[in-house]
């Protein structure tokens, strides 16, 4: 497939309109429209639905966009190699993850990686898991970390780890010596929970409903940092989180993690995702391997590599 029609197609798909693509490409709108029509005629497929508010991809168009995005990234990598800048000394690694991984774990891993590769730089987008998957699928980031309850389509899973939910509390808490807990054990204590919409809150609410209990949290917040600090400075407050989320902080802050045994709270997985079919540049591949090893040290043994 010729490069020019593919470039025009990619621009229209990303901008959603012929005029925006023409502006991006510095050509006339008619030139963009002609290239798209010729491409559809060549393939014998409709790639876009023409709508009043713009161009919407069809199912064949979605498939071609995935190919075109990989092609654009590969061309950039080749050009960088030809210019001699795609080295271990110069490269930005783009990441996306939910706050649960951005609060402590991923910043620590990136800092430790730079001890070995001081020329590495990072751009980290903190978004929800669904958005992180979409960003890596679109090629906007190199690597995504996500919490998942179901299989994720359209991306390559480089690593999948169990990510069960645990109860976080002060080491002096009455429940701190227990080997495991259930949601029923938490009813008598103040809770600090994430707001509805997070995977933790979703699974916690399901477990409570199945047990027929109504738990009203003392604190709710969309900020993991706020929830963690509340537990740290309280005597009896309990929060729920994953092991990887706070693995490097509990010891220094005299907090403990007690596993939750409710089956509903053990369904979550932590995934490392990359774009399907894409060959990452060398430094990104090194970081991916480093990240996987770090995750394996804090996750459950049942981890699978892609």
Language-model-detected regions and their locations in the chain:
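Short helix-boundary/capping micro-motifs
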Residues: 10-28
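A short LG(V/I)-centered, amphipathic sequence patch enriched
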Residues: 40-57, 62
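Alpha-helical linker/hinge and terminal dimerization helices associated
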Residues: 42-43, 64-86
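Central regulatory/effector-binding core of bacterial HTH transcription factors
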Residues: 90-152, 221
